[in-house]
């Protein structure tokens, strides 16, 4: 059974240590406060659970932040650093073309 819950990364409507896997696909660039929001992801991830971010860099010739004012682009390396600062371990990066994946474990 699948249950759809509406919420925000700013304050997720879930208990602590709830999920074995948390994903953020094409969303991190739009988070209002990345450091604070990563703490919220960490809170809902179980010990030993994983957090995976998948993003597309998009066309590098476009100034995305100007075109989409609520957007802040980060490199895979920046996101990996944010994850490590939050407490995720074994953070690693995989890239293919304009796509990147950053994964870490709690």
Task: Please tell me what each predicted stretch does.
Residues 1-13:
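Conserved SAM-binding strand-loop segment of SAM-dependent methyltransferases
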Residues 10-22:
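A short acidic, Gly/Pro-enriched loop at the edge of an enzyme's catalytic core
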Residues 20-34:
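A short SAM/SAH-binding and catalytic strip from SAM-dependent methyltransferases
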Residues 35-47:
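A short glycine-rich, Lys/Arg-flanked "PGG" loop and its adjoining helix->strand segment in the class I
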Residues 48-56:
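Conserved beta-strand signature within the Rossmann-like core of class I S-adenosyl-L-methionine
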Residues 55-61, 73, 98:
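Short "lid" loop at the C-terminus of a central beta-strand within the Rossmann-like core
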Residues 70-87:
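Short alpha-helix
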Residues 86-91, 95-106:
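Core SAM-dependent methyltransferase catalytic element
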